[in-house]
């Protein structure tokens, strides 16, 4: 006889949008670490900005694996918008802060790649904000069929 056996603990629910967002945040954080080395040589203020941005992106990426929170999504969205705005200004009119205030910087390959990843991160975070799914390593929920079967059996 083929009987269903109740599962004591449900398998983790994998949320691909969380995995994508965590990946994009971590990748942009890594690119900001790479770019930050050159910017520290230009002026310590630029380097500190890149260091703070990369730390926030690494922490945000890690949190996205363990937590689903509207506040976390909003923080990521605001952070990505600020980074993209600063990048856009630095490539159009130039950043007029620091000892070597200069005109616009040229767009390089890593700049464009990082900007694209930031846009992808924004897209996924907005998607998560609109219809939140559990983070990959949050405590898994049992699916309704298993819960119904368990309640029928009196468990």
Give the ranges of each region predicted by the language model.
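Membrane-interface extramembranous regions
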Residues: 2-155
């Amino acid at each position: 006889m083929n009987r269903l056996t109740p599962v004591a603990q449900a398998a983790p629910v994998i949320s691909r949008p969380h995995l994508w967002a965590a990946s994009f945040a971590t990748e942009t954080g890594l690119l900001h670490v790479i770019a930050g080395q050159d910017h520290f040589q230009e002026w310590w203020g630029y380097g500190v900005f890149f260091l703070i941005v990369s730390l926030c992106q690494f922490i945000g990426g890690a949190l996205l694996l363990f937590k689903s929170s509207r506040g976390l999504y909003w923080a990521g969205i605001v952070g990505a918008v600020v980074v993209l705005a600063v990048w856009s200004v630095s490539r159009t009119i130039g950043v007029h802060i620091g000892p070597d205030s200069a005109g616009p910087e040229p767009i390089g390959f890593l700049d464009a790649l990082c900007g694209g990843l930031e846009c992808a991160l924004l897209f996924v975070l907005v998607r998560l904000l609109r219809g939140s799914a559990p983070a990959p390593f949050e405590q898994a929920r049992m699916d309704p069929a298993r819960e119904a079967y368990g309640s029928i059996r009196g468990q």
